[in-house]
Amino acid sequence: GSEAQQAEWLPRIIGGEVLGAFAYVERQSRFALHDCQTTATKSGDGYVLNGEKVVVFNGEQADHLVVMARTAGDQSDNDGLSLFIVDAAAAGVDKMSYAMMDGQRVANITFKDVSLSADALLGEEGGALAVVDALTDEAIIALAAEAVGIMGVLNAKTLEYTKTREQFGVAIGSYQALQHRMVDTMMAYEQSKSLLFKALCEY
């Protein structure tokens, strides 16, 4: 963003006065960013925002959103995407929150004829893709790290359970059929961990 935007927002975010969320994933395209169908259409000195974003982390609690929207071109135009600062309480913003499998709460957010002033544009028009690309790489690796960590904990707990849970007087871990299943899950975990480390090294 501009120096004025940084001066206005960064101290408030760092100080905890403002909680933000990044809304860029869409239902039909997921991480295919160029396929963004949310639009910000010029209207007078500002814009009118329409569209939907899904799986917005912190979306339920956030009071401001950074939203990626198309300001020019079509789905084949990578240079027509821009970022906007949107008040989450503005007229036309509607949230639906839900819990993911790991318990984290996320939100789907729709924008219907949301009026934005000219200074809501974050940075330059058409400059969103480079910023979002970099953040997406980090986000995907972070999510993978979380998933691999959860997988490791669950495997360890399951292995411990097979050693202490008895059936017919012996630990269930002594049964070959269960041992085969545990080996499969451990192999999947080690493979996932190796892929995560490879992604971290290459990134």
Describe each model-derived feature in a short phrase:
Residues 38-41:
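A structural signal for short hydrophobic beta-strand segments in well-ordered beta-sheet cores
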Residues 23, 52-94:
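A short core secondary-structure module
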Residues 28-31, 55-58, 74-75, 98-105:
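Short Gly/Pro-enriched turn/cap motifs at secondary-structure boundaries
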Residues 9, 36, 52-54, 95-98:
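Short beta-alpha junctions and helix-cap segments that line functional grooves
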Residues 2, 51, 84, 109-111, ...:
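Residue-level signal for inorganic ion chemistry
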Residues 16-25:
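A short, Trp-centered hydrophobic/proline-enriched beta-strand micro-motif
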Residues 1-4, 30:
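N-terminal glycine-rich flavin-associated loop
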Residues 93-190:
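Glycine-rich beta->alpha junctions and the first turn(s) of the following alpha-helix
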